[in-house]
A protein has these predicted regions:
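Cofactor-binding active-site loop characterized by glycine-rich and histidine/acidic residues
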Residues: 1-89
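Conserved thiamine diphosphate
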Residues: 19, 55-64, 104, 108-156
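A short, conserved beta-to-alpha structural element at the edge of catalytic cores
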Residues: 29-34, 85-115
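Secondary-structure transition/capping motifs at alpha-helix termini
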Residues: 52-60, 84-94, 125-130, 152-168
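Residue-level marker for buried hydrophobic side chains located in beta-strands
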Residues: 64-67, 96, 174
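Acidic, glycine-rich active-site loops and adjacent beta-strand->loop/helix elements
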Residues: 68-75, 98-104, 137-140
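Terminal amphipathic helices with adjacent charged low-complexity linkers/tails
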Residues: 171-177
Length: 177
């Protein structure tokens, strides 16, 4: 479904593994790319591989939202340097949203603790990201945060074009808690 009902189902189903009475997936929009995931073009294989590619996936004029997991963020760290090589001239904006739910497949994550998340945010800032925390249980917060991320990056690209900033630009990074 569309609207609030649809976004609520997406958020509730993200880690759903229930099987319906007929044997089908009760939550077809789970945490992994599958035939029910419209627009899902990469899962990454091992945790974090999608993070290494999302920054250059959108072409100029396109936009991409990359939903990432805190478990993946603890695995592959090459994407930490995306602000160093993202360029508005050859790529559309990419907006990473990390779902900080403290889970990595069947384990807990370090980022599942307040100390771990605060440390990760400091790390992101040091790598050139601009972390934005928001309530990951509120669908409206996702919309507002994506809008804010887009506004911040557009403003920075404009400032770069006006000679106020230079590359690397701070890349907004949403953290859904």
């Amino acid at each position: 479904g569309n609207g609030e009902e649809g976004i609520n189902r997406l958020l509730n189903d993200f880690y759903g593994y229930e099987i319906a009475a007929d044997g089908s997936m009760a939550a077809p929009l789970g945490s992994h790319v599958n035939p029910h995931t419209a627009g899902g073009i990469i899962e990454g294989g091992y945790l974090g591989f999608a993070e290494l590619q999302y920054a250059h996936m959108p072409l100029p004029g396109e936009k991409l939202v990359a939903f990432l997991s805190d478990g993946a963020a603890e695995e592959q760290r090459g994407s930490d340097w995306i602000p160093r090589w993202w360029r508005a001239e050859d790529s559309g904006p990419a907006f990473p949203i990390m779902i900080a739910n403290g889970r990595r497949i069947e384990q807990r994550t370090q980022m599942g603790t307040p100390e771990g998340l605060a440390s990760f945010e400091r790390h992101l800032r040091g790598c050139g990201f601009d972390p934005i925390e928001f309530d990951g249980r509120d669908p409206a917060a996702f919309v507002c945060t994506l809008w804010e991320m887009e506004q911040r990056l557009e403003r920075r690209v404009q400032e770069k074009n006006n000679g106020i900033l230079s590359y690397p630009l701070p890349i907004p990074y949403g953290i859904a808690q």
